[in-house]
């Protein structure tokens, strides 16, 4: 049955390889089930419900990608867009998280429309390459800034705007240590370096008495506080247009880049150089963002960490289905998710930000007409603390 659905032999893989690849991808992505609920809670959402929503939305998206597109790609709420959701749309602009979810829903609908028409191709080709790269890099700096701030590594200063944090505080030291642990594990190519770093710092906090341990496993919290709570009518406002398109653009280009990278690694390219079933993969991704809002999630997107599973031998959608099953079983670890503090996730945010900045090497530095607006986007997204404003300034 699995052979018929996923064509394992045709793709030169096996059940054993797909299981290993699926688990590898999940381990590299698992940090999101701890980081995302914490981020969403800042916007006013119930953290327990957000944890369950993150797990279920990721599970549904991965399983859908596996069966519909037969691609070895894991999906979950995206880093960067969740920060934009919380700190800009809700925090700075003052919209409720329900209206913000409505904006995510509308952006997802537009993404679906683009995925089933030629609008996607036109959009990808009409925006200069440097600007597409710059969006991801700017979001990376945005995420990194949030990580540095939440970990106490940088603090506000009236004279210099920012200054170094107080390393005499144990929380600040643990934030820096978390980043160091993740970096060392990543350099040594340890699978799941990010989630391991978060857990090590969390258990260190428990040992020294900073965190109260409430167990590892329990029945999952209710998803009712976030389920079907998006305010679509509230998002149908002229002032929300830039926000909706910010969600759309960042998700579109992030997804396109991730899928192209995974396709090359997984040999999902035919003899003519065309990517196999790229349209189905894009439809699965865009639909997942819409589905995620039903549960109460910021935009769901394809994860570049899927490359780790491909390197482990994943070649078909069975890998994605395994990732989805792992996310589904994660809902029973809510006690652990609820005690993970900001200083444990700060290092993860900073490390993910650095990964997102790696795209700068692809910039065309010889064409000043594209380079200047690209650099404006990269710099202004974190400095204005807004993805929408940064992108707008670069395009203008």
Spans of features found by a protein language model:
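Helix-loop-helix hairpins and the membrane-proximal interhelical loops
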Residues: 1-49, 162-164, 195-279
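Helix-loop-helix junctions within the multi-pass membrane cores of secondary transporters/permeases
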Residues: 2-36, 57, 77-136, 264-359
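Hydrophobic/aromatic residues within the transmembrane alpha-helices of Major Facilitator Superfamily
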Residues: 23-30, 60-63, 67, 144, ...
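Loop-to-helix transition at the N-terminal end of transmembrane alpha-helices
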Residues: 44-63
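Transmembrane alpha-helix interface/packing and boundary motifs in multi-pass membrane proteins
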Residues: 61-74, 183-189, 247-254, 285-295, ...
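Conserved, well-structured core segments that form the ligand-binding/active-site neighborhood
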Residues: 72, 202, 206, 313
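Membrane-embedded alpha-helical modules
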Residues: 93-207, 211, 321-396
